């Protein structure tokens, strides 16, 4: 019997014609349309591409001083070949951007995008009692250190003032000694003049003192 003459279970068992599951292919078509729409939205910027979440550290206090004063008052020659970091303003090497003024620069480095680029989240760690105690201890140590530094600075100022007073004292003493010597020489010269005035005129003439005589003849 030929294939086309078979019927019933025999015919169904030897059916080589491919069958289609309409429900399965309908769902696949819908999913394909959704994927195409999502890709188009991502391309147009209507939707962000799903990326694996990156574990970021908690927001921490900055451990360095932000340099806002080093370029104040300086002039810079800018050409087409000048790197972005030297074109004026404040350059952020993390985000590779230039901010023109200090206020916006601080807003930038404290902002979400900059913190994300350095691996930080905007969440802060909740402080425990131990953290608070440790913070108080650090602040106390800092104050004591600053107090000692202030005492050392005051001691140095006192030493410098004392050295300046000693220098002035020595200078005044030296000036007084010179004045005293001049006065002594002057007194000695006056005494010599008085002694000479008591000599006999003939003796004064013989000694060559006649020109200093003030007596009248």
Swiss-Prot record:
GO terms for biological process: mRNA splicing, via spliceosome. Gene3D superfamilies: Classic Zinc Finger. Residues 129-190 form a coiled coil. GO terms for molecular function: DNA binding; zinc ion binding. GO terms for cellular component: spliceosomal complex; U4/U6 x U5 tri-snRNP complex. It holds the Pfam family zf-C2H2_jaz. Residues 188-199 have a biased composition (Acidic residues). A zinc finger (Matrin-type) spans 90-120. The keyword Zinc-finger applies. Residues 1-14 have a biased composition (Polar residues). Keywords: Coiled coil, DNA-binding, Metal-binding, Nucleus, Zinc, Zinc-finger. Residues 1-22, 142-217 are annotated as: Disordered. SMART domains: ZnF_U1 (SM00451). It is found in: Nucleus. Residues 142-151, 162-175 have a biased composition (Basic and acidic residues). PANTHER family: ZINC FINGER MATRIN-TYPE PROTEIN 2. This is Putative zinc finger matrin-type protein snu-23. It comes from Caenorhabditis elegans. The gene is snu-23.
């Amino acid at each position: 019997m030929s294939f086309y003459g078979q019927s019933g279970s025999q015919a169904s068992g030897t059916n080589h014609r491919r069958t289609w599951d309409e429900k399965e292919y309908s769902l696949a078509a819908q999913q394909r349309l959704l994927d195409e729409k999502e890709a188009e939205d991502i391309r147009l910027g209507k939707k962000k591409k799903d990326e694996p979440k990156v574990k970021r550290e908690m927001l921490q206090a900055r451990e360095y001083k932000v340099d806002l004063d080093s370029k104040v008052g300086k002039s810079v020659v800018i050409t087409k070949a000048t790197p972005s970091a030297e074109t004026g303003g404040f350059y952020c090497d993390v985000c590779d951007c230039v901010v023109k003024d200090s206020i916006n620069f601080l807003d930038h480095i404290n902002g979400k995008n900059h913190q994300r680029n350095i691996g930080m989240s905007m969440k802060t760690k909740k402080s425990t009692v131990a953290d608070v105690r440790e913070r108080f201890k650090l602040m106390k140590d800092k104050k004591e250190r600053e107090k000692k530094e202030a005492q050392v600075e005051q001691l140095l100022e006192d030493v410098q003032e004392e050295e300046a007073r000693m220098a002035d004292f020595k200078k005044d003493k030296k000036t007084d000694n010179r004045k005293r010597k001049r006065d002594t020489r002057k007194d000695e010269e006056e005494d010599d003049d008085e002694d000479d005035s008591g000599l006999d005129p003939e003796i004064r003439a013989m000694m060559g003192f006649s020109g200093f005589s003030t007596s009248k003849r």
